[in-house]
């Protein structure tokens, strides 16, 4: 406390101008805190030293008593800022902007009339009531678009509403186009080659074949084919004298794809291969077994075994 008073006296002697608050830098310093080593104004001193219980115990020295309020001079206790509320504004801006009225109207319109229908919604399709006869050409319509209507711009730039299609009239017009197309093809062909199907009078008639001559040629062809027919009775008689080339025992298919004798050779080769594999395996197994027993006999003298097939020779000789 004595050191603080000495520093204040030196400060008052050396510096004539009042010192600014080190926290807000706007007002003159009224208090000096030795614990914080800071010069504070009256407002900053209240905010700093009422923060917690430890800060209230800091010893402070008043620099100019004439700037202190009457409450402080009278010895009234300072209430904590934490109980009365913050006096300073928050450092970070708390912007609470409400939505504009136009934006709210747009949101309400979107909710009432959605452009994209929700999947599974009841308002997705609008089916008008009609008789059973009219249900054949019924197409689901979206409710929002039926109210608004379809607008298409033509080549002049103006907007015109499209008419509802009548499918029966459209089908009739398509049929008319189809038949008119055939008639146009016929007329175009007739105009392109007007004399195609007509015979010129200047031509010779020697090259023309009459119908009677054609029929005579066809009959001659039938007679020639009849001459080349097979005599089935003679073929059957010659077939009975000879044996059938097919072998019923070795016939593996109805078409005799595999010649006789090949299947027997295949079975024989498979059996020989199995026998060869068995003998090779048996020989290897016996050889391995013989080696194993020989190794046990050699190691019988090194390992003392009282039971078993192989006993040490020294024990056998002693007994």
From Swiss-Prot:
A zinc finger (B box-type) spans 21-63. Zn(2+) binds at residues 21, 24, 44, 49. GO terms for molecular function: zinc ion binding. Residues 95-115 have a biased composition (Basic and acidic residues). Pfam families: CCT, zf-B_box. CDD domains: Bbox1_BBX-like (cd19821). One of its GO terms (cellular component) is nucleus. It is found in: Nucleus. The keyword Transport does not apply. Keywords: Metal-binding, Nucleus, Zinc, Zinc-finger. Residues 90-115 are annotated as: Disordered. Residues 271-313 form the CCT domain. Belongs to the CONSTANS family. This is Zinc finger protein CONSTANS-LIKE 8. It comes from Arabidopsis thaliana. The lineage of its organism: Eukaryota, Viridiplantae, Streptophyta, Embryophyta, Tracheophyta.
């Amino acid at each position: 406390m004595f050191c603080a008073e000495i520093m204040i006296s030196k400060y008052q002697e050396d510096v004539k101008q009042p010192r600014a608050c080190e926290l807000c830098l706007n007002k003159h310093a009224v208090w000096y805190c030795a614990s914080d080593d800071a010069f504070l104004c009256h407002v900053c001193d209240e905010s700093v030293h009422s923060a917690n219980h430890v800060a209230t115990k800091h010893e402070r020295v008043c620099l100019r008593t004439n700037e202190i309020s009457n409450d402080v001079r009278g010895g009234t206790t300072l209430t904590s800022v934490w109980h009365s509320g913050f006096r300073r504004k928050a450092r970070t801006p708390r912007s609470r902007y409400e939505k504009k009225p136009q934006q709210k109207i747009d949101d309400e319109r979107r909710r009432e009339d959605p452009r994209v229908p929700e999947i599974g919604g009841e308002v997705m399709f609008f089916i008008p009531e009609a008789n059973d006869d009219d249900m054949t050409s019924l197409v689901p319509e979206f409710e929002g678009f039926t109210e608004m209507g379809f607008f298409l711009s033509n080549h002049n730039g103006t907007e015109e509403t499209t008419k509802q299609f009548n499918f029966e009239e459209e089908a009739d017009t398509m049929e008319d186009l189809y038949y008119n197309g055939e008639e146009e093809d016929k007329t175009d062909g007739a105009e392109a080659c007007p004399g195609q199907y007509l015979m010129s009078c200047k031509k010779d008639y020697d090259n023309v074949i009459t119908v009677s001559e054609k029929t005579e040629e066809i009959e001659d062809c039938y007679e020639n084919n009849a001459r080349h027919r097979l005599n089935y009775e003679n073929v059957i008689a010659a077939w009975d004298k000879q044996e059938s080339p097919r072998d019923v025992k070795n016939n593996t298919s109805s078409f005799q794809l595999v010649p006789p004798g090949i299947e027997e050779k295949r079975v024989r080769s498979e059996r020989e291969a199995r026998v060869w594999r068995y003998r090779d395996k048996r020989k290897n197994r016996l050889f391995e077994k013989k080696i194993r027993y020989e190794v046990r006999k050699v190691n019988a003298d090194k390992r003392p075994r009282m039971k078993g097939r192989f006993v040490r020779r020294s024990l056998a000789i002693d007994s």
